[in-house]
Amino acid sequence: MATTTPPETKSAAWWNYFFLYDGSKVKGEGDPTRAGICYFYPPQTLLDQQELLCGQLAGVVRCLWDLSGTPPMLIRMRNLKFAIRADGDYLWALGCGVEISDASCRQFLDQLIGFFHFYMGPVSLAYKSHPQEELSLQWDTSITQVLRSTSESHRIFNALWNLDRTKVEPLLLLKAALILQTCQRSPHVLAGCILYKGLIVNSQLLPSLTAKVLLHQTVPADQRLPGAGAAPQETGAALPPDVQITSVFLSEEEVASLHEFPVEHETRLQGSSVQYPPWDQSSPTQAEDAWASAAIPEPTPHDGACPSGSGADERLPRLEQECAGPTGLCTTACGQGSGLSSRLQKELCLSREELDSSEMHVSEAQEAFPPLPALGDLETLHSSHSAPTLPEDTAICSCLHPCPLERLPESGRLGQLADLPLTNGQTQVPGTDPLPSSMPVALPPQHPVGVEPSVEPYGNGAQESHSALPRSSRSPDSPGPSPSADRTGFKPSPSGRHAGLVPMNLYTHSVNGLVLSLLAEETLLSDTAAIEEVYHSSLASLNGLEVHLKETLPRDEASLTSSTYNFLHYDRIQSVLSANLPLVTAPQDRRFLQAVNLMHSDFALLPMLYEMTIRNASTAVYACSSPAQETYFQQLAPTARSSGFPNPQDCAFSLAGKAKQKLLKHGVNLL
């Protein structure tokens, strides 16, 4: 839901038990079970009951793990269901009521574990470096905040609390987005979010990261998580007023997501570490031609069309000084977006006679710098030519012939060749003929920091190594190392799925009820100038945004106008809810939520399901689903015909049209 947070939950009948169990402390028959209990909720449970529950569940998990090779994720009982997570010797279990869906039960457990790892790091290291009482306070704080900020509708979707955007001027939302983009230009800052009284105004983070940041903001200052805010005192950094920097830990997947979208941030980092060549200082027309030539490959003449002679020879030493890397070799700008104009590219091309001689130099250079052996059964072709030793002041450049789209190999072949080293610029591919020795050779260019090379087949077998996108912006289908994100399998090792945690900094700046939260690299804490830049670049904008939000949002949220319909809209991308349900649900609203819970479970089990209508003798609920959203609608007005049999006059058949019409004013487009 939007607009406000619910009151503190007094009773949580749906949340029965939660515990963390360390099996490494209970190995023998004489070891007491209580020695392995790291944390148990509710804490007032008798110790004998804690031992009974932890021992029985740990035994069942270990038995199923040994039989199937994978620990169970959900254990059902008569009146309870337990979501299970295993990480080496550690076992987490969350017991919920049977009315909670299986997906929500597992999501709540993952959320709790994510909170702990975000603020305390890996659980194995946390329990070695912190006292158990301090970590128990961390668990108490996380559980309290989850129960306090969870309504009946949020228990179904496990969604975040967001600001009702229909009650806020769009320019204010745009201003919040511009503030975050401005902060991204500062050093070390990756992404962030802006919150107002515990509600999301704008966020660049994943929903899981936003939920962790929300937990930090909702905890009072005197009850902050252990270790929060201790980093500035340890390093002696002087922070601006109302600013706090907390050490946090992110998974490798979350760090990769922070590097995907901020193009300006990536450009800034590369620009600070790469020296641009002098020819970038060209006229606007030449710069546009350079970008066009880099983006659209032009056909290269074959028979001596590339200019050669004194003019080209005079430019080679200059190019060697500007582009030569550690190996002293230079490549053309073919396939790179380095800003070279088409005129310079043509001047760097060699004739066929020069290519033959340069190919002999390549083999000599490879003998001086032997590459790694090729993997698999692919046979590497080595040139049999011999030539004098390559002088140090010689630059070798070559251009590849254009490859039409119809000659490109299949995508599967790309994955097989991506990890092969370049030996002579030629690699024999199974099922193809070797390239003749007179074919042009392309050498791998030098790559700036944070950019890794990728190899793609070019033509019938020649490969061109060119600059790829940064690691963070790699497409999901591209080959390369990727962190494990499997939620269904857990390896029985101490490392587990949360072992690859990366330390980061959480920068928070509070302006009354408005909070700016930024995730930055660990080096931000030691860079006082960067902290001052972030603070001063956003201070005035945050003050203005806070004043406008205070004047725009309605102050009395309790006086909600009665409506003739109920609706609930769930954004799957941002994991937020929009609804017109009251904070205190009536019996009729509970029946609506029961129907929503049932249909949401069906949508999760049947991804191809698009629409459904569920009804009883008195009312009907319409639902539609897409990969991006779920929408539920109920008409509350009494109808003349509402029998349980299909009838053209039945209200259930008109719900789809009414939902599309009435939800437009709430910003929900079902057309």
Curated annotation (Swiss-Prot):
GO terms for molecular function: guanyl-nucleotide exchange factor activity; protein dimerization activity; protein homodimerization activity; small GTPase binding. GO terms for cellular component: BLOC-3 complex; cytoplasm; cytoplasmic vesicle; lysosome; melanosome; membrane; platelet dense granule. Keywords: Albinism, Disease variant, Guanine-nucleotide releasing factor. Component of the BLOC-3 complex, a complex that acts as a guanine exchange factor (GEF) for RAB32 and RAB38, promotes the exchange of GDP to GTP, converting them from an inactive GDP-bound form into an active GTP-bound form. The BLOC-3 complex plays an important role in the control of melanin production and melanosome biogenesis and promotes the membrane localization of RAB32 and RAB38. It is linked to Defects in Hps4 are the cause of the light ear (le) mutant which exhibits hypopigmentation associated with defects of multiple cytoplasmic organelles, including melanosomes, lysosomes, and granular elements of platelets. The gene is Hps4. The keyword Repeat does not apply. Residues 467-477 have a biased composition (Low complexity). PANTHER family: BLOC-3 COMPLEX MEMBER HPS4, HERMANSKY-PUDLAK SYNDROME 4 PROTEIN LIGHT-EAR PROTEIN-RELATED. Residues 269-286 have a biased composition (Polar residues). One of its GO terms (biological process) is intracellular transport. Residues 269-291, 417-497 are annotated as: Disordered. This is BLOC-3 complex member HPS4. Coiled coil: none annotated. Highly expressed in heart, brain, liver and testis. Expressed at lower level in skeletal muscle. Component of the biogenesis of lysosome-related organelles complex-3 (or BLOC-3), a heterodimer of HPS1 and HPS4. HPS4 and the BLOC-3 complex interact with the GTP-bound form of RAB9B but not with the GDP-bound form of RAB9B. HPS4 and the BLOC-3 complex interact with the GTP-bound form of RAB9A but not with the GDP-bound form of RAB9A. HPS4 does not interact RAB4A and RAB7A. The lineage of its organism: Eukaryota, Metazoa, Chordata, Craniata, Vertebrata. It holds the Pfam family Intu_longin_3.
